[in-house]
Amino acid sequence: MNTFIVYDSQFGNTERIAQAIADTVRAFGQASAVHVDPAHPVSFQGVDLLILGSPTQGFRPTLAMQFLLGNVSSQALRGLAVACFDTRFRGRLWKSSAAPRMARQLRTMGVEPIIQPESFFVKAMKKEGPLLAGEVERAATWARMLFTKAQASHPAMR
């Protein structure tokens, strides 16, 4: 299975999570993690599992991730297993975050994520983090679960 992780990262926290996910799924197949760049469109050709990750800014994905989602065609995503994650503060005041919004946008394009969006947490009220203890390990666990779910829901990936 070929896994492609597209992420944005402002302070390195989302990148650390993306790399932990890539490192974990490499045990099962090919995996690469790339920083989203609006100036360089990405191709999903040959991708089986697409994972999108963004820090939460103003309860939504970064502008670069919004640009990617706003400019990719639903046809380009057809047949892919897709999942979303974000990094954010933990707290009751945070009603929304980037990953659920990305998943919602995918649904409006006719693409159903194979698993609920996941949030990984940074130290409270510090934009630059660091990630809370155990979040990188939790990302690896999530990646294994996600990979298993992708194989079960997309038989061609076995």
At which residue positions do the language-model features occur?
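FMN-binding flavodoxin-like domain, especially the glycine-rich phosphate-binding loop
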Residues: 13-16, 23-34, 46-158
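Extreme N-terminal starter segment of soluble prokaryotic enzymes
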Residues: 1-4
